[in-house]
Amino acid sequence: MAKDLYAIGEAPPVGEVPARMHAQVVRPSRYGEPRDAIRDEVLDVPEPGPHDALVLVMASGVNFNNVWAARGVPVDVTRTQARWGEPTDFHIVGSDASGVVYALGSEVRHLEVGQHVVVHAGQWDHDDPWVLAGRDPGLASSFRVWGYDTCWGSVAQFTVVQAHQCLPKAEHLTWEEAAAPTLTGSTAYRMLHGWPPNTVQPGDVVLVWGGAGGLGSLAVQLVRLAGGRAVAVVSSEQKGRYCMELGAVGYVDRTRFDHWGVPPAWDSPEREAWTAGAKAFGAAIWDALGERTNPRIVFEHPGQDTIPTSNFVCDRGGMIVICAGTSGYDTMIDVRYL
């Protein structure tokens, strides 16, 4: 018989569900920096609904949405949870996982208790007419990101997810390898391959912001696999060398530049200095490539500090594709460079 609570790193027999679990939890009363806001707590293990699965988490990834959740900005995650009928007094962080199925809802037929799975981060209502019509679930009105828009994230001993989120784990991968790319990897893939005709092609130059981070490191590898040429933007030579090991053809150390952020007014004396900085950054891309070719795709996620520069260096007919705003949400586009 399962114990009431297992120590972190200890697992009950397959199929035996304890009453309580350890979890990394955020509460509205302590929104702030992650080191203070995210704390280990003991909570009741959630019960799966008819279309759900309860998964013992073997490994979980880390994403910037953990930071956003901890701060309660730009979204108060506990308020968002109310929309889905979930608890509103706490939030468990985490949107990547690999693990073992421990319990199933009454309507689930394609999974088995004991099955090893990876968990993707997309959730939606099972009866959403948009999804049932075969359209992109990510654009459905009921779409939400598990572990950010929802309560029961992955940094816990157990998580409850919609059954369709569970995919078979490849046997040759470790738990950690299987868990790492389920949110960042799918996001990076969609950014690079999801917007035809603006998809990475052999020979394409792709500028990857934050090349050594979770999104960027996967983007660099996906560009390489597609035959493209990734130029990583990093904050140190060490990170640049790491990106080269992943398959980047070159890198640019952004700490060499100081023109970041929203540019001064176009007709102000300060704008000339900003433009000189952006031109120097573009020249650094050419130096990294060894040729005067601008990026056909700019892989963006910092947002406010970098979008103006991305717009400046992107090639004619190219694409800036963005999934976040880690440096801020307000930005500016100079239409002369569109």
Q: What are these language model-derived features?
A:
Residues 44-61, 74-133:
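Glycine-rich beta-strand-centered segment in the early N-terminal region that forms part
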Residues 83-86, 95, 123-210, 257-268:
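NAD(P)H dinucleotide-binding glycine-rich loop of Rossmann-like/cofactor-binding domains
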Residues 225-305:
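Adenosine-nucleotide cofactor-binding segment
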Residues 318:
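Glycine-centered, small-residue-biased loops immediately flanking beta-strands
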Residues 201, 314-315:
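Helix-to-beta-strand junctions that scaffold the AdoMet/dcAdoMet cofactor pocket
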Residues 326-338:
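Rossmann-fold NAD(P)-binding glycine/threonine-rich loop
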Residues 187, 214-215, 305-306:
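Hydrophobic/small residue at the entry helix of a nucleotide-binding pocket
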Residues 210-211, 302:
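NAD(P)H cofactor-binding loop motif with strongest signal on the N-terminal glycine-rich segment
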